[in-house]
Amino acid sequence: MMATPPSSGSNANGGNAATSAPQHAVDAYARMGVSRRKPDDPRSPVEVDRDRIVHSHAFRRLQRKTQIVGVHSIDFFRTRLTHTIECAQLGRAISKRLLDGSWEQVVEAPEHLPDLVEAACLVHDLGHPPFGHTGEEALDELLRTRWGMRFEGNAQSFRIVTLLEPKKYQRLESPVGRPLGLDLTRATLRAMTKYPWTERTAIAGDVAKFGVYDNADDQAYFDWLWDGDASRAQRTIAGDIMEAADDIAYAVHDIEDGTWARLIPIDQIVQLEPWAVERIATLADRRYPGMFASHADVEAELRALFGTLVSSDWARGPFDRSRRSEGGLKSFCSALTDDMLRRVTEGGTLCWNDNEPLQRHIAVLKSIIWVWLIEPPELVTRRYGQRRIIRQLVDGFLDEPGMLPYQDEWARVADAGDPQRVRFVIDHVASMTDTYAAMVHREMYGTAMGAGWE
């Protein structure tokens, strides 16, 4: 679901941020670093991007980062890694449906579109910190209140692939040089940029989401990405497809996980029990103001989404994890996904940001997820503890920076002032998996002994 730009029709420097456009640049497949492509390499530049992402440290860490339900709870639940893989599969499916509908006229190099969307999907969650939404909120609140800075998962993903991931390094006139992250092509970087405006613009416009931090390294790469003119920054078609795939994967698959875990009372939702409808509608009012005129509208959406289950035996009572119930749940989620894929590619064109019926469906499904998986009262203690871990890790590393990795890089920012020092620490904490963050916190504060690395 696309975020509203900081001001109507504006991006980081005054361009149109809400307009998605095809990738029309002479050097769309250029990289910032020196390219030494092997002559016998059969891969396209975007396929090279995809392979670099898959083999990266940040991608591997997604296997131990929370999607919705904590990775430590049970192995069945999706992690950020499995969500990312499923998102990439849906992105390719949407791309192929559009190309089958003779959509080539609006896409440069249509033969690369599925690979480009897949690469964007694979990279889109690399910047998410430990503990899912709770970790992201904790880091953002900490930065806002203490230093007037921000944390945002999408901007962190951009920072990882353009700076932090140890893959490519550019030698400059100085002996230090500059890390280039994965050194991805312009095409892939543009496709992954869901919010083409900066941290400063987001703060000024009181907008939650943004795509790039306000520091010299990130801004320089962002300017290069748009041929030296960041005012041209805008969403791309591949980026819109990636967002559609992400929202569908998130909305449908987390409903499946929550139902299987018996956290979401699917039978009560199917039966439109008043208490369940009220909780969903109240959450939807808060997270999607103005989308629904009344709670009756939310109930109508629930009836449209779950009405087919009224006559299903497995959904008439609490989920029992029988093979029959598991098959019924899987069939329902598959049908829901197929329906959304059909709607998003209806008429042979991408129907996403302006597809109000589909956006309302997504909003209701996400509201269910927030009610029972993200903000349930039963998880208040766990979320409090996770926020505390995040805050105390940041404080501990700032107090004793000798515990940080990359000490040669820390030496260059140690006396540079709070913004650079703090961002360095945040980069490290955000890179941690759930389990590693908890382990380091225990050792840092003397509640456990041992050694580990990641």
Q: What are these model-derived regions, one by one?
A:
Residues S157, I390, V429:
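A residue-level signal for conserved active-site and pocket-lining positions in enzyme catalytic cores
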Residues K65-D75, I368-L373:
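A short small-residue
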Residues H83, F131, G135, G153, ...:
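Hydrophobic (often cysteine-bearing) scaffold residues that line and stabilize catalytic clefts
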Residues M2-P42, R50, V54-K65, I85, ...:
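Sequence-structural signature of the catalytic-core scaffold of metal-dependent phosphohydrolases
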Residues G402, Q407-M449, W453-E454:
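C-terminal amphipathic alpha-helical interaction region
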Residues I280-Q420, M439:
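C-terminal subdomains that position terminal phosphate/3'-OH groups for nucleotidyl transfer/ligation
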Residues R78-L81:
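Low-complexity, highly charged intrinsically disordered N-terminal segments
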